[in-house]
């Protein structure tokens, strides 16, 4: 099992690499790539940790060596949000980065599962899909926008609010990965009573705006890196388990049946070839139905911006 992390010298990338070095199955290899010259040193640093995971680091303008033979590719390359920036502000810089890296994925490891972390995820996944399609290697079962951080936040905030063990809270978060497109299905949380619709609305808004909470708290020093790394590691390890035959369910931003939008975050069952089954959303509350319908124009616009970046 070979996992490649592109953008491995950044705040998310280094933390993600550490988590994978500690948690990948014995005999795995971890390949780190970044334009930053420090990247081989990050790999050397990690290589001193005694786990049976081999780490290599590559720097420069070409990620080809890092990608050769990769089974899973995680892309966190690009610029991070700063105070006052929206995820859409990131588009201009990050779109070109995702395009060029995905072109290399298509060349070097066309059958790999690809997880996009770089924001704005709603659009970046569409860019990656169109690049892979142009290269003739697109398999919609194997391309994911990693929205797991929305789930981690929802689990944490629900547990704080209701005095629960956060490791025992499970909740699907659907839609997309920015602002109003993030929709936690609070009505589906087991063994929790909501005191009012106001409580649900307030918690939904907190989950939707949690990224901004971190950006502001870091006071210009970055965005959510450590929690995002944990989210990406959780999703990557789910892919690893699924590749070994386990039946794993996670939410991810994927191309499904197109009922709501071409790409949509929903629960999926993972298998040896990526998505094995697209699961239903279950019963939604009236508030959730309304919020779902209200987000679609924004989500579809985000997707179109990604498609148009490649197709003109």
Curated annotation (Swiss-Prot):
One of its GO terms (molecular function) is L-malate dehydrogenase (NAD+) activity. The active site is at residue 177. One of its GO terms (cellular component) is cytoplasm. Keywords: NAD, Oxidoreductase, Tricarboxylic acid cycle. The keyword Ubl conjugation does not apply. NAD(+) binds at residues 7-13, 34, 94, 117-119, 228. It is an enzyme of class 1 (oxidoreductase). One of its GO terms (biological process) is malate metabolic process. Substrate binds at residues 81, 87, 119, 153. It catalyses: (S)-malate + NAD(+) = oxaloacetate + NADH + H(+). It comes from the Bacteria. CDD domains: MDH_glyoxysomal_mitochondrial (cd01337). Its EC number is 1.1.1.37. InterPro entries: L-lactate/malate_DH, Lactate/malate_DH_C, Lactate/malate_DH_N, Lactate_DH/Glyco_Ohase_4_C, Malate_DH_AS, Malate_DH_type1, Malate_DH_type1_bac, NAD(P)-bd_dom_sf. Homodimer. Catalyzes the reversible oxidation of malate to oxaloacetate. Belongs to the LDH/MDH superfamily. MDH type 1 family. This is Malate dehydrogenase. It comes from Mannheimia succiniciproducens (strain KCTC 0769BP / MBEL55E).
């Amino acid at each position: 099992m070979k996992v490649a992390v592109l953008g491995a010298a950044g705040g998310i990338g280094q933390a993600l690499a550490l988590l994978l070095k500690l948690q990948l199955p014995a005999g795995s290899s971890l390949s780190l790539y970044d334009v930053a010259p420090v990247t081989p040193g990050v790999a050397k640093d990690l290589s001193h940790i005694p786990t049976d995971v081999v780490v290599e680091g590559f720097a420069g303008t070409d990620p080809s060596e890092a990608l050769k033979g990769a089974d899973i590719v995680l892309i966190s390359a690009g610029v991070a949000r700063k105070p006052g920036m929206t995820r859409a502000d990131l588009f201009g810089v990050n779109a070109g980065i995702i395009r060029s890296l995905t072109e290399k994925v298509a060349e070097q490891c066309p059958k790999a599962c690809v997880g996009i972390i770089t924001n704005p995820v709603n659009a970046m996944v569409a860019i990656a899909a169109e690049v892979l399609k142009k290269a003739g290697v697109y398999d919609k079962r194997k391309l994911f926008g990693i929205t797991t951080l929305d789930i981690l936040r929802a689990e944490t905030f629900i547990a704080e609010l209701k005095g629960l063990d956060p490791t025992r809270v499970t909740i699907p978060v659907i839609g997309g990965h920015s602002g109003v497109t993030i929709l936690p299905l609070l009505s589906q949380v087991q063994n929790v009573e909501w005191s009012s619709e106001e409580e649900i609305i307030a918690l939904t808004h907190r989950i939707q705006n949690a990224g901004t909470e971190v950006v502001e708290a870091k006071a210009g020093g970055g965005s959510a890196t450590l929690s995002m790394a944990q989210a990406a590691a959780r999703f990557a390890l789910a892919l690893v388990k699924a590749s070994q035959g386990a039946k794993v369910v996670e939410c991810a931003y994927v191309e499904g049946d197109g009922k709501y939008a071409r790409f949509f975050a929903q629960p999926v069952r993972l298998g040896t070839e990526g998505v094995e089954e697209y699961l239903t959303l279950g019963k939604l509350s009236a508030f959730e139905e309304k919020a779902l319908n209200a987000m679609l124009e924004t989500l579809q616009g985000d997707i179109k911006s990604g498609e148009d970046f490649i197709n003109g």
